[in-house]
Amino acid sequence: MTRYTPAEIEARWQKAWRENEVFKAIRSADKPKYYVLEMFPYPSGRIHMGHVRNYTMGDVIARYKLATGHNVLHPMGWDAFGMPAENAAMAIGGHPKDWTYGNIKDMRDQMKPLGLSIDWSREFATCDPEYYGQQQALFLDFLEAGLVYRKNAIVNWDPVDMTVLANEQVEQGRGWRSGALVERRELTQWFFKISDHSEELLSALDTLENWPAKVRLMQENWIGKSRGLQFAFSTIDGPDGHDRIEVYTTRPDTLLGASFVGISPDHPLAKLLERDNDNVAAFCAECRKGGTTEEAIETAEKLGFDTGLRVRHPFDTAAELPVYIANFILMDYGTGAIFGCPAHDQRDFEFATKYDLPIISTFLPSQDADEVLSEAFVPAKTEKVFYNRGFAGAEFQTGLEAIDAAIDFCESNGIGQGVTKYRLRDWGLSRQRYWGCPIPVVHCDDCGVVPEKKENLPIELPYDVSFDTPGNPLNRHPTWRDTPCPACGKPAQRETDTMDTFVDSSWYFARFTAPRAETPTVMEDAQYWMNVDQYIGGIEHAILHLLYSRFFARAMQMTGHLPQSAIEPFDALFTQGMVTHEIYQTRDANGRPVYHLPEDVTDGRLADGTEVEIIPSAKMSKSKKNVVDPLGIIASYGADTARWFVLSDSPPERDVEWTASGAEAAFKHLTRVWTLSERIGKMDKDAAGQGDEDLLRAMHVCIHDVTMGIESFGFNAAIAKLYAFTAKLQKSKAGYGAQRTAIMTLAQLMSPMTPHLAEDIWAHQGGDGLVTTAPWPRADEAMLVSDTVTLPVQINGKRRAEIVISADLSKEEVEKIALADPAVIRSLNGATPKKIIVVPGRIVNVVV
């Protein structure tokens, strides 16, 4: 050993792990299994520091579990379908398949130098026919089980990508990929029946004790269970077949405040009216240009069209309410019709103000409050208010009490029925794109929609496609599209829609248990490896991916692909923070920001002396030039330094800011550990030392603290303990035996974080085999109890001294020692203490 050379060390130990197949996962009855999985990446072509942090966290857990005697499954794959590949093909003239597999190779080559404990033999991409062919088999099984169906639906249409978007893929009214304003269209779509599982998906959240409470709450709100009233308004001289307008409301207590009825532009009544009225037709067409998401609806200007129709109030048949077609009402929420209560709903308030409709309060903050409102009064349902127009329950009651009373009243008087509904809608999976999993059905003029035969799977994507024009190339590919009907053999056409890419990521965790099987899963492997013991990924996937995966696990269990024990696929979930970096910017003549690379800025100025504005802790973004390239860091400092820094600088659930000085400090520390090992290796093997027991006691405390830190995801806290123990070992005068034991234990404790350095130290000190497979050190409980304790002494709240005393002294003995300390005597300066407070094992407070 001469000096710390990460490039040489890391390559050597990665080769050793590879040749010894250390991370290859094989079923074993002799060890408890542990399945750790990070959310697999999209193959963009370059890894970023977020990848480094995410996969390093998973690697720490995987390596720790391997050392503690577990049979670890730690796989890697690629979430490879989706629009970016098609966009790249259109931009550079290539093919999505070539672009994707090229990126996968590049990212794999970038990822392997990190030294991750991945079983690469299980690797797959979702665009592999071997993978999506099994996904097609799952689809057919789901179809047979009634979990998939087809219907006409109002969808979010991206006019640039020319595809359907799920509500969650629309951001501020725009497509999440293209940025185009989203439109509403009615198309025939395939759906998963996730809504049938609403109650189970909701109630089972209580069993996910090792998930963040925030994620469970987000899913609970998304599923959106509500108790309300279903009733009808009678139309006055309405069109044939429309003598009633059905409404579902979660606030039946506000019925006496109703001033209008609103219906969706896609409500059957609105569609009937637009046939004969050009103005209605034009208004409805304009409404359909907006997206279907709640966000799009809420941010759009509230517009209505008075149909001229009137309905009777169910409590007062003499009262008539106007019927408006309104752009903020969606057909697939509730019944597609609402009653407007402007006094207690801000959206209705704005609408009523715009169209000069009555604003009628049904409850007030207090009995003497003013009824004239400048905005809607919307208290929490748990707040007690005065019902000035109540019809059920007490005058003073909470909203929850009033809602229950209103439902009881309406049921008793034949006005309506109490109903439980869910916000969760069925999952539309059809996408009008090429680069996705083909839906394995055929459309036959004689037989209708016919499932493809399983022996014909996979239905592979054709390679010879063109992206010269927008839309789905599969529609323009007759030799692929045209096929015999599987049922009758007559000419038919394949389904040209492909599956939403969230389907691909909703079961990949199960496929990893048997990635080369000729069925979606192998039950024996699924029973052994499932569930995922620890899942790691971003909070941005709290709703879509995680909820869909929970549904898929249930569907796979229903169709015989997973055991009952795996219907909740992720036992524990950890959502990590981002890696951030400063942004360096100046302003152009128009005041617009101009971004600069970090290497172009020195002491807050550019080379020409221009002062730079520094924005701290910003998300890394190529456009803002604050992206740190992991490959550059690895080349300069090594993978262990990158790993150490992203783990050490912040709690893992919080963002960590990347700084060059932090990386340099991490590298210097690892160099110190290296140098320390070299010094210990050169010690006289027979020389006696001082403080052996003290060093070994500190070592066992470190073992305990690091173990607890790793098990609780407190990686930064564990590393802080490693820093402290390293400093103690550097100063130690103990003999060779104690110092060798300490440095080898330090290598073991650092191994999950800095595996290459740990292997080299272990080998240099003569350790058996690989440190990666060495048993995790155990703390001796007896060594964790110290004979002495160090107590700070405060005088009137200010720290004045420290005393080292026996741990078993009485309070009176501690008082005597504290008052006899020279520093305390000087600080008292002859004053007599009024009170002495001894907190055992913690502190001595002297009050004068």
Swiss-Prot record:
PROSITE patterns to which the protein is assigned, alphabetical: AA_TRNA_LIGASE_I
Amino acids binding ATP: K622
Key words, A-Z: Aminoacyl-tRNA synthetase, ATP-binding, Cytoplasm, Ligase, Nucleotide-binding, Protein biosynthesis
Residues in the signal sequence: none
Name recorded for this polypeptide: Leucine--tRNA ligase
Gene: leuS
Localization, UniProt: Cytoplasm
Gene3D superfamilies: 2.20.28.290, 3.10.20.590, HUPs, Isoleucyl-tRNA Synthetase, Domain 1, Valyl/Leucyl/Isoleucyl-tRNA synthetase, editing domain
Principal place of residence: cytoplasm
Motif ('HIGH' region): 41-51
GO molecular function: aminoacyl-tRNA deacylase activity; ATP binding; leucine-tRNA ligase activity
Transmembrane segment boundaries: none
